[in-house]
Regions:
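Enriched for short, Lys/Arg-rich terminal
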Residues: 68-70, 74-98
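Alpha-helix N-cap/helix-start and coil->helix boundary motif
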Residues: 12-13, 39, 70, 89
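Basic/aromatic recognition patch in beta-strand/loop cores that engages polyanionic ligands
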Residues: 40, 48-80
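Arg/Lys-rich, positively charged N-terminal/basic patches that mediate binding to nucleic acids
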Residues: 1-35
Length: 98
C-alpha cells in the first residue's frame, strides 16, 4: 500500500524552524544534511508506518528522527500525517502528541 505524507502546519513550522536554526547557528551544510536525513526517515516511515513506537495516545506514533529530535505522526487510511518534530532536550512527555 502506498502512503501519502501530509505535513500539518505544526510539523512544517517545526521543520522550517530547525532548518533556520541550523543555517544561522551551524552551517548551510548542516541544514542540508538534516533535510536529507529527514527525507530518508520519511521514506522509511512511508514504506513501513507501523514499526515505530506508539505513544500514550493510541493512534499517535513516534520515531527518532535524529540524535536531537523525535517525529510524531499518525496513520489514517492511506495517509501518514506528520504532527510535529519535538526536540529531545525538552521533556517528550510534555508534548501534546505524546
Amino acid at each position: 500500500m502506498a502512503y501519502q505524507l501530509i505535513w500539518t502546519a505544526e510539523a512544517d513550522s517545526d521543520f522550517h524552524s530547525i532548518m533556520h536554526y541550523l543555517r544561522e547557528n551551524w552551517s548551510v551544510y548542516s541544514a542540508q544534511k538534516f533535510a536529507e536525513r529527514t527525507i530518508k526517515k520519511l521514506d522509511k516511515i512511508a514504506a513501513m508506518p507501523y514499526q515505530p513506537k506508539f505513544t500514550s495516545q493510541p493512534t499517535v506514533q513516534m520515531i527518532k528522527l535524529d540524535r536531537k529530535n523525535v517525529l510524531f505522526f499518525t496513520v489514517e487510511n492511506n495517509n501518514i500525517i506528520l504532527l510535529s518534530i519535538y526536540p529531545y532536550k525538552k521533556d517528550i512527555t510534555k508534548s501534546s502528541h505524546y
